[in-house]
Amino acid sequence: MTWFIDRRLNGKNKSTVNRQRFLRRYKAQIKQSISEAINKRSVTDVDSGESVSIPTDDISEPMFHQGRGGLRHRVHPGNDHFIQNDRIERPQDGGGSGSGNGQASQDGEGQDEFVFQISKDEYLDLLFEDLALPNLKKNQHRQLNEYKTHRAGFTSNGVPANISVVRSLQNSLARRTAMTAGKRRELHALEAELETLSSSEPAQLLEEERLRREIAELRAKIEKVPFIDTFDLRYKNYEKRPDPSSQAVMFCLMDVSGSMDQATKDMAKRFYILLYLFLSRTYKNVEVVYIRHHTQAKEVDEHEFFYSQETGGTIVSSALKLMDEVVKERYDPGQWNIYAAQASDGDNWADDSPLCHEILAKKLLPVVRYYSYIEITRRAHQTLWREYEHLQAMFDNFAMQHIRDQDDIYPVFRELFQKQSANQSA
């Protein structure tokens, strides 16, 4: 008889392979649930895990069953109202005695939505799937690292989903062979001695009995060697290796003027938090430059960018001028892939909008890989949007999107950073 002893330290992950299969099978429904859930989160809670709900109808398995129509014979418990062969009238729709306030239905059963928890890593992987920085190219000098997963031999620790059955059985065979080799040689010698002794005359019964006992003991010891042990287990090892890719810098330009109310600022912050998570999740050492502006623009750190209360009038060109200065000072376009994301409510001093058009057309768009403008407003577009529309017609690396409310943030983000196909990038 063979005994299997489960000594795995990671027993809680025994269903990992089933979980991964489930995530692959219902990816579309899960991504839909995630896109709806992200809009309900607070600004500071964008990157945690998520409880995902899927309608039961979407995960139900096909099955054969009897139809609702026709005549069928059933056996019911006895009662004091009916006897054998009595006909029971079919109840009218709505004739039930339930306590609910909804409309009656002929369907008497139902199920709640299926709800399960996904981890932070699973959540972010699904959130940013198929997204990439547009027009990213390799430059001549320093590089950032984009990590990709590669096979890297075998390891003695891992999750059950990565176990290598063939390598584990090979180790099991080698261990059992090594542990029982001496006993098997001794067993063969005793069996040969017993065979010789049995054919000799006169019979030596006591000696034969002793040999049989020793043979039985050796066989028992050999059988007690476990078929497989924790020591034998080998898991496929995967490691993340840097995949050379060009270094990049992202400029985040946010309007904090008085016309931007708190709700509009929160939507802008949500967009930039998504952008930051996407960059940090997908690429290593991408530099981010934060610029806040009202009548004056200022380069700030991450904390001040998201939490400063400073406000004022609106001159958008101040942020574009500052970006141009920073690019010339620190980021040579020949060595860097330069990106920018600008968020505003569209309000701007009327005489300043043509200047914004000029700065972008002559100084920034010729050197950046991609420039995205997001206008957050429910009002009609003003001069800044109209000036930028001319730029969109002139430059392929300029994109504009309109956000009206919180539900538009994630779809707009995916639209701006959707991974391009080979034909599109060419």
Curated annotation (Swiss-Prot):
> Basic and acidic residues composition bias: which ranges?
78-92
SS bond partners:
none
UniProt name for this protein: UPF0229 protein YeaH
Q: Which organism is it from?
A: Salmonella arizonae (strain ATCC BAA-731 / CDC346-86 / RSK2980)
Query: Per the similarity annotation, which family is this?
Result: Belongs to the UPF0229 family.
Question: Which Pfam families is this protein grouped with?
Answer: DUF444 (PF04285)
Q: Which gene encodes it?
A: yeaH
PANTHER family documented for this protein: UPF0229 PROTEIN YEAH (PTHR30510:SF2)
Region span, Disordered? 78-108
